[in-house]
């Protein structure tokens, strides 16, 4: 993943609530799946394996975040396991059909979680993070972001 993507995900994480964080994890998984496909088409098998390993780590994070006190978690768990197994098969076979099927499952779940996140108006997880203002200034070819009121103690409050 490129450094610019990492910065974008980092900024999004610092501004999101619990529901938004799940959506961001899906987006990170999609970024690594795209990277894996690009590596495979470029015959970079090591990069392919590494990207899929990181995508699987994202799915692992989704699995760890399940709360089995809710019925929906019992339905999500087998889907996440299916996706992990499809990724593992893709590494072995070097064929993208399993990965494409896994991606379809994840896209449907991403859409559902995105809709749920739109209805979640809870406060951001990181209460003491810098505020990011986009659209205040523009570069020649891109939108610049402005950070306001830098503080020394940012992030989670203990």
Predicted regions and their residues:
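Residues at alpha-helix boundaries and the short loops/turns that link adjacent helices
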Residues: 42, 69, 93-96
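Short, charge-rich amphipathic alpha-helical segments embedded
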Residues: 56-74, 110-121
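N-terminal leader/targeting segments and the first structural element of proteins
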Residues: 1-67
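Amphipathic, charged alpha-helical scaffolds that flank and support histidine-based chemistry
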Residues: 87-103
């Amino acid at each position: 993943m490129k450094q610019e993507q990492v910065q974008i995900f980092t900024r999004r994480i610092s501004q999101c609530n619990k529901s938004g964080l799940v959506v961001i994890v899906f987006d990170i998984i999609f970024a690594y799946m795209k990277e894996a496909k690009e590596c495979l088409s470029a015959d970079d098998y090591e990069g392919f394996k590494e990207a899929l390993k990181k995508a699987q780590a994202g799915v692992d994070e989704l699995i760890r975040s399940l709360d089995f006190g809710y019925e929906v978690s019992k339905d999500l768990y087998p889907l996440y396991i299916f996706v992990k197994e499809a990724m593992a098969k893709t590494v072995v076979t070097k064929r993208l059909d399993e990965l494409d099927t896994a991606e379809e499952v994840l896209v449907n779940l991403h859409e559902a979680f995105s809709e749920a996140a739109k209805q979640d108006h809870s406060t951001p997880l990181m209460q003491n993070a810098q505020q990011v203002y986009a659209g205040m200034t523009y570069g020649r070819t891109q939108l610049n972001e402005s950070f306001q009121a830098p503080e020394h103690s940012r992030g989670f409050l203990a």
